[in-house]
């Protein structure tokens, strides 16, 4: 993995501004940074959600994210990227995921960020359990996430 690629899976929260500064520090070749931050919603389908618990397959999750990061780095002219995904119990309003992509121009940064998030939502080995007043339930994959990820497949 190139030195300008950061992939972390962690329980602790992250600071978006600090992560962006780390990606761009000392880099005069960056003209655009696109960020996506996913935040835990407090409701789903009209039901109040107290928290999410995210689990992952250690080692495999990092390797799969790294593989897609390498694809993004080779597919678009990026100068760097960061993917940070939290695991453990996350309450409403807290950060879940951060994707940062840096490039000389915005188009590549936008496309790569969207590609990475589509992959994370559809295929990354994470499992999500919702907690509500009604109890807990595992969240199933959504077909629209699969469709979004499929559009990036080269034929």
What does each model-found stretch correspond to?
Residues 1-96, 110-114, 118-155:
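N-terminal, polar/charged subdomain of small-to-medium soluble alpha/beta proteins
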Residues 96-103:
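Short glycine-rich or small-residue beta-strand-to-loop segments that form or flank ligand, phosphate
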């Amino acid at each position: 993995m190139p030195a300008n690629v950061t992939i972390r899976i962690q329980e602790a929260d992250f600071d978006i501004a600090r992560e962006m500064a780390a990606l761009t520090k000392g880099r005069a070749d960056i003209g655009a940074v696109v960020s996506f931050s996913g935040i835990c919603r407090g409701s789903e389908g009209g039901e109040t959600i107290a928290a999410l618990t995210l689990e992952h397959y250690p080692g495999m999750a990092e390797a799969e994210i790294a593989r897609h990061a390498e694809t993004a780095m080779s597919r678009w002219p990026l100068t760097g990227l960061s993917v940070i995904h939290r695991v453990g119990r996350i309450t409403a309003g807290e950060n879940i995921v951060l994707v940062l992509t840096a490039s000389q121009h915005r188009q590549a940064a936008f496309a790569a960020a969207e590609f990475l998030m589509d992959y994370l939502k559809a295929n990354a080995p994470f499992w999500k359990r919702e907690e509500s007043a009604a109890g807990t339930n595992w969240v199933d994959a959504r077909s629209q996430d699969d469709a979004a990820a499929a559009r990036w497949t080269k034929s």
